[in-house]
Each structure stands twice: as C-alpha cells, then as structure tokens.
Amino acid sequence: MIRVAENDAGVTVAGHAGCGPPGQDIVCAAVSVLVQTLALSLNRLSPGETVYSMEPGSATIRYTSLSEKGRLLVCSFFVGIEAVAAAYPNNVTVTRRGSQ
C-alpha cells in the first residue's frame, strides 16, 4: 500500500503498491512520476520554497509557505494522485490536510 499524506509541513509518500514485480508495477510508476514531477516543478518554478528527498519506497517534499504558483502545483499533484487512488483503492491511500 502506498500512503500519501499532506500536512502543514508538506507531502510524504511511503510504501509500495504491490501491483507487479519491481520495475513493472504501473501503480508505483504512476505515483512515482507524479511525486517526482511535483518535487522538480516546485524546485524549478518556485525556487527556494521546498526541500525534498526521494528514496525507493519513500519521498518527502517539505514546504512552509508557497507562492500562488507553488500552491497550484500542489493542487495539480493531488488531482492526479487522487485519480490514481480512486482507480486503485487497494493500493493507494491519500490523506489531505484537514480531512482526518
């Protein structure tokens, strides 16, 4: 199960989808590309606002305040990640800030 969580400090992603062998798991690939795109886009389009780390099975994107552009990028990430979670509810969960 991949768990995506938003909190006041940023976004964390942890776990494995378990939908296929390593390198062939389409759910893991979808989540990975969305997370990497968010981190790289924030870094490039809103420089200085974020710090991120990525390792196999986990990623953390930290931010304390975001510009309007940065907030739009985060919202866009959640549109995509929530679509993946809706399509694969047994493999991906999403918790948004304020939704607990």
Where are these regions (language model features)?
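N-terminal intrinsically disordered, cationic/polar leader segments
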Residues: 1-26, 33-100
